[in-house]
Curated annotation (Swiss-Prot):
InterPro entries: Aldolase_TIM (IPR013785), DUS-like_FMN-bd (IPR035587), DUS_fam (IPR001269), DusB (IPR032887), DusB-like (IPR004652), tRNA-dHydroUridine_Synthase_C (IPR024036), tRNA_hU_synthase_CS (IPR018517). The gene is dusB. This is tRNA-dihydrouridine synthase B. Gene3D superfamilies: Aldolase class I (3.20.20.70), Putative flavin oxidoreducatase, domain 2 (1.10.1200.80). It comes from the Bacteria.
Length: 321
């Protein structure tokens, strides 16, 4: 699959997730088989660009793979400026967020709230596409509410504005993450436009990935929550798509290696004073199937020292040896 001038190595994309797809996680997903990874959502508000949080979220030239940054906002000029700044910092693809259902984002008329206003959508897409010389992509939901699904209209508008690829999450904004994703809307969009269409939502295992590709005709898949604590899902899915065979479960020793390496990277990236806090949620996700009684996770979350976290993980896995 191609996005503009860039050829992806496969059809699996790690979704942008606020507070999750930081540089350590993106790098790990890429190493585990993702063909593309997308940064956390970056605000287009220039007042926050110099904050520590924004600087950490920006991509850098030495990151592996095709460097892709997602931006969010409602002002066309600010969005264009944000795109330019991120390209200057190393972004090779700009993705526009019109899919986030969070209230704090929607209250600012950003994210999926924009789907209610196609004229504003058109203005934003036009400004951003004209502002940069790299491919611009768009992520949306199927609409604002089940009774207001307008993804076909938005998709056609996006193609007309020069968007190079479109990701669709198979829920409306009103659905949040409740219920099941539906793929009829994604299938309809794929039949309507000629730009690449990427299916997103509830793609949790290799069999589901194959089924969604076959049903929708999508060019690629974007995987988000299913990769939390399981970044090797990209390798599992790609192997199944290539061979029709399922890989055996990842050995516990490999889970330990990946988890401990991930935690060390978080400590290094954020610094010991903040890294241990960020690591807590990732450790919880990794250990969901190994620590069902939550006792270790409760103990781990009380640790306030980076080195003690690693010692606790070593001791935890020794109990399974």
């Amino acid at each position: 699959m191609r996005i503009g001038q860039y050829q992806l190595r496969n059809r699996l994309i790690a979704a942008p997730m606020a507070g999750i797809t930081d540089r350590p996680f993106r790098t790990l997903c890429y190493e585990m088989g993702a063909g593309l990874t997308v940064s956390e959502m970056m605000s287009s508000n220039p007042q926050v660009w110099e904050s520590d949080k924004s600087r950490l979220r920006m991509v850098h030239i030495d990151e592996p793979g095709i460097r892709t940054v997602q931006i969010a906002g409602s002002d066309p000029k600010e969005m264009a400026d944000a795109a330019r700044i991120n390209v200057e910092s190393g972004a090779q693809i700009i993705d526009i967020n019109m899919g986030c259902p969070a209230k704090k984002v929607n209250r600012k008329l950003a994210g999926s709230a924009l789907l209610q206003y196609p004229d504003v959508v058109k203005s934003i897409l036009t400004e951003v596409v004209n502002a940069v010389d790299v491919p611009v992509t768009l992520k949306i939901r199927t609409g604002w509410a089940p009774e207001h699904r307008n993804c076909e209209e938005i998709a056609q508008l996006a193609e007309d504005c020069g968007i190079q690829a479109l990701t669709i999450h198979g829920r409306t904004r009103a659905c949040l993450f409740n219920g099941e994703a539906e793929y009829d809307s994604i299938r309809a969009v794929k039949q309507k436009v000629s730009i690449p269409v990427i299916a997103n939502g509830d793609i949790t295992d290799p069999l589901k990935a194959r089924a969604v590709l076959d049903y929708t005709g999508a060019d690629a898949l974007m995987i988000g929550r299913a990769a939390q604590g399981r970044p090797w899902i990209f390798r599992e899915i790609q192997h199944y798509l290539d061979t029709g065979e399922l890989l055996p479960p990842l050995p516990l020793a490999e889970v330990k290696r990946l988890l401990c390496a991930h935690v060390r990277e978080l400590h290094d990236f954020y610094g010991p004073a903040k890294g241990y806090r960020i690591a807590r949620k990732h450790v919880s996700w990794y250990l969901q199937e190994h620590a069902p009684n939550d006792q270790f996770r409760r103990t781990f979350n009380a640790i306030e020292d980076a080195s003690e976290q690693l010692e606790a993980l070593e001791a935890y896995f020794e109990n399974f040896a």
